[in-house]
Amino acid sequence: MSAESGVPTYRGRGGIWHEYKWENYACQTAFIRNPAHVIDFHELRRIEALKCEPHVGHKIITALQTKYSNTSIVTQNIDGMHQRAGSQEVIELHGSLWRMRCDKEGKLFENLSQGKYANRKCSCGEFLRPDIIWFEDQLNESTVVNATHVISQCDLFISIGTSGVVWPAAGFQQLAKKGGAHCIEINPEKTELSYLFDDVHREPAGQVLSRLFDSLL
């Protein structure tokens, strides 16, 4: 979804993990070893994300959520583009670049408008950790429960720009289908799960969402 806005991807062709080793930047071990180094890396991701703007697809989703309150957004992206487009309720499976947390005191700090971190340490003296699901981390259980609940209850499920191979997201289409949902895939590239969808679109998300929903907004 965000690649269409120009946000660098992590796993895709030419993605960030082709240039950097996640073992040095995106795991708790790396953070313990060199927190400033890890924070520098994520600060750069924030700065790069702020150079990009939400595209028409993000704005259509926000408009749908505003008009139809039962519209749910579940994302694996950590760049905050949905919120910057105006969406209020976003289930973030992998956390957010824009939140920092103090694991010692359980505090959360969020800022969607500033690339550089306002503070790198909590008032207690501990380094603040990006509130992101890193490699080797466990997903937040309540977030997963929330996501699976709304997906199991939906009547229309749209997968946008994801390979669908990372769990639990890999099982979301089948969960939605089991509940009777019509399932649509929007992805320029064929995925391993494409054959499971009722409709498949190989065009940019903004273009497809405009065609599907402009008449409803």
What are these language model-derived features?
Residues 1-217:
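Conserved catalytic core of sirtuin-type NAD+-dependent deacylases
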